[in-house]
Swiss-Prot record:
Lineage summary: Bacteria, Pseudomonadati, Pseudomonadota, Gammaproteobacteria, Pseudomonadales
The protein's role, per its UniProt record: Involved in the biosynthesis of the osmoprotectant glycine betaine. Catalyzes the oxidation of choline to betaine aldehyde and betaine aldehyde to glycine betaine at the same rate.
Active-site residues (renumbered): H475
Record organism: Pseudomonas aeruginosa (strain UCBPP-PA14)
InterPro entries (UniProt xref): BetA, FAD/NAD-bd_sf, GMC_OxRdtase, GMC_OxRdtase_N, GMC_OxRtase_C
Family as reported in the entry's similarity comment: Belongs to the GMC oxidoreductase family.
GO molecular function: betaine-aldehyde dehydrogenase (NAD+) activity; choline dehydrogenase activity; flavin adenine dinucleotide binding
Protein known as: Oxygen-dependent choline dehydrogenase
Length: 561
């Protein structure tokens, strides 16, 4: 079977769905969207109910469930690396935190030759274009975009307010919008949830607009085997359908757009003969183009939890008990309200741990229950926790193809905690979190420290706790980076260096990981590049003001030292 389209998009994740929707707005353009996973079943509470966010991570239907190689600085642990599978990609299984990154992340990108139009003020119009915020638009937020964003409301859990107040009492700024004028500080955290209380994945927000268009063809359970080339030009894709072994072929008249994410995009390029020559040679893959940066520069956010018992019965611990869940589920299903309609990450913050950092290097998510991210090992009492992680680790990893078999996972190594700066940031972060948690605002609630525990104090004790307990925040990125240096894979429009008719558009093309969760920024990048592909003028630059700390101290005097 062979078909021909103008564009073939490989991967229906956050970026691929944006491109499929925007490109098919032009009625004379035909698009094939290939997705290795299945549909985003709207009746499956595991992906549709925000509070059920732990469930998709536990199975394989919606999760590629990659594992790292033994991480040498983490006691050789093989660490989890979940990625979304199905229409929506990782937006179908993520934590739904709507965080864009810091303005200075993008200004930093724009200092690289060829990336000058990636400054914050160039990107902000595309963040706004993608968003509908429930309380309306302003200079920073959109009012009519495909991504539904819900803000925390009065009357939510008192622990959220107490944790924000504790951050302010510890001497840090208060901010009313982590995506607005000032990211630095503590405040409410927005989430990608619809007004009806459903997960706002990109299958819902974007693809629902485009599914009925005659110029869009969506094929699920389609695992791309390799990109087809004529010389240096991408001309199509060979893919497997379901469990079959007979490849189908589709041809692209204009471009092949790789949107498979930071793990699978470099894997697919390498399998197709675009990557480091020595690696291709070792696997007997005919080299189409020697591009050493494919799979290099891999970055992620690492985080850990500090957990406390709660002296008052105000945590959502009862909601983890099966006998309370039918009522929560019914309220969510029929009314779109209640505990089920929230991801429970309704407060957070960003701080600088030392003067050397020009913008925040630590992120907090606050959660009014003590439990693991994937729903396991819940503490059997009322509790709460702070997720704390460093934002711009100097550690760099890599993705290496292990086999020409498209169903075999690649070798993944993040090299977590391979720099002294990593250890300094995490030790500082744990100690500062304890100071925050010890402020008067939490006195009515704070019981004993459950984790790490009061006996974990010295550098050596903290380091061993980090080695054993730090986990991924599920933010792999930067493995096909934008730029013009020898290790760059794509230019500022996502076009693969040295190739024709081939782009990569997803979190893998970030040159440097951002300060915060990745989904909102991945959507923004796809919106921006979609205009380029369509030959449209970029949206006018924003003139919004944004905070630069400059000489401001990292914190003021705490209420309780």
């Amino acid at each position: 079977m062979s078909q021909e389209f103008d564009y073939i998009i490989i991967g229906a994740g956050s970026a691929g769905n944006v491109l499929a929707t925007r490109l098919t707005e032009d009625a004379d353009v035909s698009v094939l969207l290939l997705e290795a996973g299945g549909p985003d079943y709207r009746f499956d509470f595991r992906t549709q109910m925000p509070a059920a966010l732990a469930f998709p991570l536990q199975g394989r239907r919606y999760n590629w469930a990659y594992e790292t190689d033994p991480e040498p600085y983490m006691n050789n642990r093989r660490m989890e690396c979940g990625r979304g599978k199905g229409l929506g990609g990782s937006s179908l299984i993520n934590g739904m935190c709507y965080i864009r990154g810091n303005a200075l992340d993008f200004d930093g990108w724009a200092k690289e030759p060829g990336l000058e139009d990636w400054s914050y003020l160039d990107c902000l119009p595309y963040f706004r274009k993608a968003e509908t915020r429930d309380i309306g638009p302003n200079d920073y937020h959109g009012g009519d975009g495909p991504v539904s964003v819900t803000t925390p409301k009065a009357g939510n859990n008192p622990l959220f307010h107490a944790m924000v107040e504790a951050g302010v009492q510890a001497g840090y700024p208060r901010t009313d919008d982590l995506n607005g004028y000032q990211q630095e500080g503590f405040g409410p955290m927005d989430r990608t949830v619809t007004p009806e209380g459903r997960r706002a994945a990109t299958g819902r927000g974007y693809l629902d607009q485009a599914r009925g268009r005659p110029n869009l063809t969506i094929v699920t359970h389609a695992l791309s085997d390799r990109i087809l080339f004529s010389g240096k030009r991408a001309i199509g894709v060979s893919y497997l359908v379901g469990n079959g072994d007979n490849p189908a072929t589709a041809h692209a008249r204009r471009e092949v757009l790789v949107c498979s994410g930071a793990i699978a995009s470099p894997q697919l390029l390498q399998r197709s003969g675009v990557g480091p020559a020595a690696l291709l040679r070792d696997l007997d893959i005919p080299a189409v183009h020697d591009l050493p940066g494919v799979g290099a520069n891999l970055q992620d956010h690492l985080e850990l939890y500090l957990q406390y018992a709660c002296k008052q019965p105000v945590s959502i611990y009862p909601a983890t008990k099966w006998w309370n869940q039918p009522a929560i589920g019914a309220q969510w299903l029929f009314l779109g309200k209640g505990l089920g309609a929230s991801n429970q990450f309704e407060a957070g913050g960003f701080i600088r741990t030392r003067e050397a950092f020009e913008w925040p290097n630590i992120q907090f998510h606050f959660l009014p229950v003590a439990i693991n991210y994937n729903g396991s090992k819940g503490v059997q009492e009322h509790g709460f926790q702070a997720h704390m992680g460093s934002m711009r680790s100097p550690s760099r990893g890599r993705i290496h193809l292990k086999s020409r078999d498209p169903r075999q996972h690649p070798s993944i190594l993040f090299n977590y905690m391979s720099h002294e700066q990593d250890w300094q940031e995490f030790r500082d972060g744990i100690r500062l979190t304890r100071e925050i948690m010890n402020q008067p605002a939490l006195d009515p609630y704070r019981g004993r420290e459950l984790s790490p525990g009061v006996n974990v104090q010295s550098d050596a004790e903290l380091d061993e706790f980090i080695r054993n307990h730090a986990e991924t925040a599920f933010h792999p990125s930067c493995s096909c980076k934008m730029g013009s240096d020898d290790m760059a894979v794509v230019d500022g429009q996502g076009r693969v260096h040295g190739m024709e008719g081939l782009r990569v558009v997803d979190a893998s093309i970030m040159p440097l990981i951002i300060t915060g969760n990745l989904n909102a920024t991945t959507i923004m990048m796809a919106e921006k590049i979609a205009d380029r592909i369509r030959g449209r003028q970029p949206l006018p630059r924003s003139t919004a003001k944004y905070y630069v700390a400059g000489d401001a101290p990292v914190r003021g005097n705490p209420v309780r030292a």
